[in-house]
Amino acid sequence: MNNNKVYSLNVVSFEKIIFNDFVKKIQVSGSEGELGIYPGHLQLLSLIKPGPLLILDDHDYQHVIYISGGIIEVQPTVVSILADTAIRGLDLDLNVVLDKKLKLENKISNVDCIDRNDVIQQLSCELAKLRVIEMFKNQYIKKNN
């Protein structure tokens, strides 16, 4: 392993360690836009928006993880992500996500909805999960063709 071409990535949620390995690059949605983190990246501290975390590990295998939000800290040889919630693409259930999305859409259309912004935020998270499921599915299809 050439240390100039990889760095250590730690992804943890409040419940458990999701990922801890050497990687070549990651891509995640930061508070100010998309972040592509490569070896030797400048130090950085940023909020993370809900969406996919794309990882290319040191064996050229791609991982897709849903992040509901959190913080990323970039150091010269280590990147740490503390996620509010983190779920591997493999563990997301399409039917559960679609069902929750439909319920939230119906709730938004209800004019009596008390906290519309909260429902919109929840819907945004479900849409991000759907993007992760789609990315995982596409990655699986490419790998098996």
UniProtKB/Swiss-Prot annotation:
Q: What is its main location?
A: membrane
Q: Do you know which InterPro entries this protein is assigned to? A: ATP_synth_F1_dsu/esu, ATP_synth_F1_dsu/esu_N, ATPsynth_dsu/esu_N
Can you list the GO cellular component terms from the UniProt entry?
plasma membrane; proton-transporting ATP synthase complex
Location in the cell reads:
Cell membrane
Q: Does the keyword Nucleotide-binding apply?
A: no
Q: Which SUPFAM superfamilies match?
A: Epsilon subunit of F1F0-ATP synthase N-terminal domain
Q: Which GO terms describe its molecular function?
A: ATP binding; proton-transporting ATP synthase activity, rotational mechanism
Subunit-structure text: F-type ATPases have 2 components, CF(1) - the catalytic core - and CF(0) - the membrane proton channel. CF(1) has five subunits: alpha(3), beta(3), gamma(1), delta(1), epsilon(1). CF(0) has three main subunits: a, b and c.
Record's protein name: ATP synthase epsilon chain
Taxonomic classification, please? Bacteria, Pseudomonadati, Pseudomonadota, Gammaproteobacteria, Enterobacterales
Its encoding gene is what? atpC
